[in-house]
Amino acid sequence: MNKFLIIDGLNLVRRIYAAIPDETDMQSLTERVSSACTKLLRVHRPTHVAIVWDGDEISWRKQLYPDYKKGRKPMPEPLAQGLVALQDHLTAMHIGSIYAAAEADDVIATLAIKTAKAQGEAIIVSTDKGFSQLNHRQISQWDHFNQQYLDIAALEQKLGVERSQFLDLMALAGDSGNKIPGIAGIGPKSAAELLKTFRSLPTLFSSLSNLGAKQAKKLAEGKEMARLSYKLAQLQTDLPLNINLKDFRVIDSLPEKTINQD
């Protein structure tokens, strides 16, 4: 069985970069990233590995909602200037890169789902909890910095909803980190309580008459914003990848087919 280690490139690199005292010390960054990748390979023993990078195009999410991720700090100039050399170094280590047009998240999600559907195992290396929506038994998420898998049960307990309701929760309460708006006046706790009672957004919005007038008014007025927020939070899992698995092979394995689903 194929085991694909999928690394969220900038999520890993920027966290490592932030811990380097001298922001111009790209040699130290290269060494630390190389060490991290070597450790990831040693710990997980994948058959395949890829590191996925964000691109420069404006994402479809930002086109849909211009405030999406508004206020995010730009990449530090030394890192921006040294990124290509770092990517080349990783290629020399036989860690293949995949370059997204805009956000890496949708490419990572697509690759993970396609791997799982092909009876393989996908391990996403990222601290971004947005990947927790990929509810498939063959997909897991590894936090390199805490050296542990994402604990879905603990996350469910923290959020107060089941995994299948994570997107509904973000649709109602938003996501401040990504500037996903949600419905004005509906916070995470009240959103979780609503989902405990009504289970899903369609059921909730068809049951507003069962709520108090004030809360029902908020939800009715915010219905379209909830739909927008859901769409912004939901990862795309059906992008055409057009990659050949042999280009990302770590160890000898049986011949692979090309992933090229439209």
UniProtKB/Swiss-Prot annotation:
It comes from the Bacteria. It holds the Pfam family 5_3_exonuc. Its cofactor is Mg(2+); K(+). Binds 2 Mg(2+) per subunit. Only one magnesium ion has a direct interaction with the protein, the other interactions are indirect. Binds 1 K(+) per subunit. The potassium ion strongly increases the affinity for DNA. One of its GO terms (molecular function) is potassium ion binding. SMART domains: 53EXOc, HhH2. Has flap endonuclease activity. During DNA replication, flap endonucleases cleave the 5'-overhanging flap structure that is generated by displacement synthesis when DNA polymerase encounters the 5'-end of a downstream Okazaki fragment. This is Flap endonuclease Xni. It comes from Shewanella baltica (strain OS195).
